[in-house]
Amino acid sequence: MRSTAIHFRTLMLGAATALWLAGTAQAAEVHVMISGGLSAAYNALVPEYERTTGNKVITAYGPSMGTTVNAIPVRLERGEPADVLILVGYALDDLIKQGKAVADSKVDLVNSKIGVAVKSGSPKPDISSSDALKRALLAAKTIAYSDSASGVYISTEMFNKLGITAEMKDKARKIPATPVAEIVARGEAEIGMQQISELKPVHGIDIVGPLPDDLQKVTVFSAGIAKGSKEPEAGKALIKFLASPAARETIVNAGLEPIVGGAK
């Protein structure tokens, strides 16, 4: 019975995908640049898009912002090929203003919350309120946060809201070009904070939970077509699929909240 149900869901996903991707008859090579927040769900969904359309997807990963070698703005500046850009919404807005992405192609895909993680088997601190999180951060010897959107918020706003900016100066560090969860899993930080969707795929950690509501920063991840794309129609079809009901279950399982009607 279980295998029958799984087979049925697979058939339904394929059928739904075919409907959403109707009109992409000729195979294409689609270059995608994507930041970490949506990567796990995207990686799970791309094979279905490729199978249904015959298109081949070539993916480059990197932060939505910053100056590291893999950051999406840096990749674009180097002239790397791109058809689809998937990153933090306001970072995509910046690329649109710079003439590097097509303005009317923007689609908001998901909302993403920040979570807290510890090494597997370690005691889970109380983070049920802002005061509890403050105590946990002050008690921790080492703290890690990302070099992308969540880390910018944590280091420039959240610590200040909690009144612990000075105390965090020597114990909290920004992690460039590496998932924060990997640092926590290796025991190099007692507490890690990053998008829940970026924490979930990493083994060796336990997710304590999301930040308290009064400290939470929900990040919108959006997709758009890169200016100068060689395959804009195939790129639009991929974005349409990622925003479709066929992708919803995979996105939710990755710790994200799909945005309905995200087209701008």
Model-predicted segments: where are they?
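Bacterial N-terminal signal peptides that target proteins for export
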Residues: 1-13
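Bacterial N-terminal signal peptides
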Residues: 10-22
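Exported/periplasmic ABC-transporter solute-binding proteins
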Residues: 27-70, 74-81, 90-98, 103, ...
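Phosphate-/polyanion-interacting regions in eukaryotic proteins
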Residues: 86
